[in-house]
Every structure is written in structure tokens, then in C-alpha cells.
Amino acid sequence: SFKGGYLASGNYYLTEDITLASIIQINAGSDVKICLNGKSINTEDVTGYDYTIRNYGTLTLNNCDTANGIINTYSFTFLCYNNSVLYGNAAIYSPMEVKGRSKISGCTLNNHITCSANSEITGGTFLDRTYIHNSAVISGGTFNQEVKVFDSGVITGGYFSKAISSYNGNFIKGGYFKTKPDDSYIADGYAITASGNSNYPYKVVALHTCNGVTYDKPLDSSFKGGYLASGNYYLTEDI
């Protein structure tokens, strides 16, 4: 019987597939958790709306039956705006726009995503193209298709299977890469080095210079000991 509307803070779960007749909206300050429970939210019947799911608050989309159930909104865009946050493990099949200092920290996106206006991707799996611009940041997540960076977008972390493309240089400050990034994309004070990860053999790290020697192999608290190959290492925290 649920066909759309405003969702107040709370923990919701689907008991059957839903086809929306109007938008779903989560207002600023609301904390909404939805478990798809192996069911789908469809939007084929929604007309007259550019965005059919609008998140202005904190939205967690989970699915305890990942073999079934998706956000099935192929023809309409999922909007995250105005300091909103998206978490979860659900599969989303709509294009997504992320604006206004919002954050994507989970879910699997099967369509393209555009991230702008000081927003950030910190996690999630991205199976189609990703576009970042207007001071947007990628600091985490797994990207299986091309990532395009415009104007002031920045990459500080994440795992990238395909090539990065950009009209501007000096924007990569971290991350793991299957394909070696173009040297012109690496920010000043950073370098491409071997990652030790066979799936993502290249990583970008900050350089450290001391007494005229440049160090390009950071060690953090995850290092607990072992054999060290030839190289210049520096500590980023106590070990």
C-alpha cells in the first residue's frame, strides 16, 4: 500500500515489492534505515519527477537477501543533497546525483554517479562510470569502470580497476590502481609506487623528505613486523 511520500526517522523493511506513484523523501535531520528484505522498490509509475528518491538526511539501504531485491529506478535519478549520507549494502540501479556536501559511504551502484559541490565518496561499489567535479572528493570505495575528474575534483583513496581521465592535472593524492595513472595526474608531493597488491599493483603515496633523502614507502600501525624489501620507508604513526 506504500506508494511514496515522506519517511520519518525509523527502521523500515519491505514485505513485498513496491511500485512508487510519488517520490520518497527523507528530510534533513531524519535518520531512516530501510531493509529491502529481498524485495524491490520500483518507480515505473512515477511521472513528472526528475528525482524519485530524494535524500536530505541520513539513509541506510540494506538488504538481508542480496540475491533478490533492488532499487529499480532505471529511468529516474536518485538524489543525495544538502549534507545527506547514504550507507548500506543494497543494489541501486538508478543514476545518482550527489550534491551539497553529501556523502556516499555504501551500497552497490549499477548506474552512473555524479558527485559535486564539496561532496565525498568514502565507500561503496561502483559498477558504472563515476564523475566528480566542483571540489568533490573520492576517499574510498571500489570503482570497476572509468572515473572522470573535472575541474577541482580530488582522489585521496579508493580502488580503481579502469583508467582515470581528467582535463586537469595534479589531483590524485592516494588510492590503489590496476592501471598506472598518468604522471601528470599525481599531485605535487606524491608519487606512484608498487602496492604489493596483485589486483591493484600501483598506489599513490605522499613523499617524505629528510636530510636530503626522499622516502616513498609509508608504514602505519597496520605494520606489525616482517621482512622489509629494499626501499625507503617512513613512519606515519607509532608502530
PLM feature spans:
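Extracellular/surface-exposed low-complexity segments
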Residues: 1-7, 140-141, 157-158, 162-165, ...
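Tight coil/turn sites that cap or link beta-strands
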Residues: 10, 17, 29-31, 37, ...
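Low-complexity, polar/charged sequence tracts that form flexible coils or short amphipathic helices
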Residues: 53-54, 77-79, 95-99, 113-116, ...
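Intrinsically disordered, low-complexity linker/propeptide segments enriched in Ser/Thr/Gly/Pro
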Residues: 86-92, 124, 219-221, 226-239
